[in-house]
Each structure stands twice: as C-alpha cells, then as structure tokens.
Design a protein with these regions (language model features):
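Structured core of small recognition/catalytic domains
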Residues: 116-175
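Short S/T/G/P-rich N-terminal loop/turn motif that feeds into the first structured element of a domain
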Residues: 1-124, 140, 156-159
Length: 175
C-alpha cells in the first residue's frame, strides 16, 4: 500500500455534502483494498485535503473520481512524524495546516535529515504541537499539521525550526 495526497476544491453545494462524498470515497477505496487515512477541510470549507492508503495512483484516482470529488492534486506522499495507527487515533487533534513548496534540488534524504535536526526546536513554542508531515515523493511540497491555539503560534513554531511557510490554513477533521 502507498499513501496518496488528494486536494479537491469544494463548490458551495458540495460543502454540505462532504460527509456523503467521503462515505462514497471510503467505499470506493475499500473496494480497491484501501482506506481513508484522514480528511481535513479548510475553515472556509473551500478545499478538502484527503490522504488515502491505497495500492497505486490509478486506484486513488478511480476512487476519488467515483466519489464525485474533483481532483486538483493527486501525489504520492511520505508520512513523517507519526505512524498510521497514531494518525487514526489523533487525526482530529490538528487544527492548522502549513504548506511549503519545497525548493528545487532538495532531496528526500536531505529533507529528512534537516527535519530530524530541527524538530526538537519546536519545544521553544510549547503551546504548539507538531503532529505530522506529508512530503510529496516528487519533492514538490510538504504539508505539516499542527495543534495550536492560533495561527500566530504556528508561525512562531515554524520560525523556531527555520521552516518556510507558503500558506497557513485553519482546518477541521471530517474523517
């Protein structure tokens, strides 16, 4: 099995139906031997971010399209910071999502080494809990999830670990 990040924009009518769409996605993924790891919706309910544990990109695309979701992005990702079992128990904890478009030429090994060196520095901002990161296998971007009292604290935490921010979104777990 592999992890796939799916981003989908939601139109106003879909916002009310997101639970039904995710139920359909779960059923489609299950038919392909997969499962939804988590689904987060941006605060304004304009975008849903889904992580699927499924056999391959083709199976992920098929499941998402059959669930009626429009795919804006579908990429293989690597999980950093928690294992799948921990996510299933804690996925409702994260309330902020930070996006970072990774610089060209950065390797996964270099990224992981830097992450390991810098992660202890999050202790400088104790009100923020780093939850997990999904790093696109093509090294195009990463999504970092945090539990935090507010956006300013997330920004301070990112500064503590010298990590850039391209976007910060308040999120809510929906599955």
């Amino acid at each position: 099995m592999a992890l796939f990040l799916i981003e989908s924009k939601l139109i106003p009518g879909e916002r009310r139906r997101i639970t039904q769409m995710l139920d359909r996605l779960a059923a489609e993924a299950k038919q392909a031997g997969g499962d939804i790891v988590e689904a987060q919706v941006s605060e304004e309910a304009a975008r849903v971010i889904i992580v699927l544990d499924i056999g391959d990109a083709r199976g992920a695309r098929h499941a998402v399209e059959n669930a009626g979701l429009d795919i804006q992005l579908l990429k293989a990702v690597r999980l950093v910071g928690q294992d799948l079992q921990a996510i299933k128990q804690r996925k409702g904890t994260a309330n902020y999502l930070v996006e970072w478009n990774l610089p060209a030429g950065l390797s996964m090994d270099a990224y992981l080494k830097r992450k390991a060196e810098k992660t202890p520095l999050y202790a400088e901002v104790p009100e923020v809990s780093f939850e997990r990161t999904y790093v696109c296998e093509d090294m195009s971007k990463c999504l970092c999830l945090y539990a935090s009292p507010d956006e300013d604290a997330v920004v301070r935490a990112r500064k503590a670990v010298s990590a850039p921010i391209d976007a910060v979104n308040k999120i809510k777990n929906v599955r």
